[in-house]
Amino acid sequence: YPLRRQRQMCIRDSINSNPNRKVTGFETYLHSHDKTATAIDVASRENAVIELEDKKINYKKLSMERKITATMASSMFLKESEVLASIIQEELDKKLTVPNRGVKQAGFYVLSGASMPCVLIEGGFVSNSGEEKNLKSPSYRKKIADGIYKAIIKFKASREKVLAEE
C-alpha cells in the first residue's frame, strides 16, 4: 500500500490537466471503484503518471487479494473521506475565484488501501494558461494551502465532536 497506517488522515495534492485547455477549477477526489467512463478515464490518466516516477517501488502492482483488501480498507472510511472532501471544497471555494468542480470519486492508486479518511485535491489545471499562471504564483498557492489548513482544522473538530458524543 502506498500509505502508512499510523496517520489520522491522508491528503494528497496534485495539479490537473485536460485535453480541453478551456477547463478550469479545483476538485477533490476520494477513492472508489470506477463506475463511469469519465471516472475510468481520469483514474487511468492519473495512475499512468506512476510509470514516470523514479521510485516506482513505492507502488506495488495490486494482486486480486490486495485489491480486495485495499477496497475494504477504503470502504471503511468512505463516509469520513466524503466529509473531508466536502469541507476541503467548501474552504477552497472561499479562497479561490476559479470554478468549484466538486467532490468526485475515482480509482486512483495513490488513494487505495488507506485505513483512514483519504482524498486527492486537484488544485487547478496546468493545461489552462490562466490557471498555469496562477499555480506558479506563491500567493495563489498560499491561498490553496490556507484553504486546506482550515479544512483540516474544521474536519478534526467535527471528528472530535462525534467521538465525544459516542
Which positions does each model-derived feature cover?
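Hydrophobic/aromatic beta-strand patches that form the interior of the parallel beta-sheet core
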Residues: I11, Y29, V119-I121
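A short, glycine/acidic-enriched catalytic loop
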Residues: S17-L52
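Active-site-adjacent mobile loop/cap segments within catalytic or ligand-binding domains
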Residues: N16, T69-E166
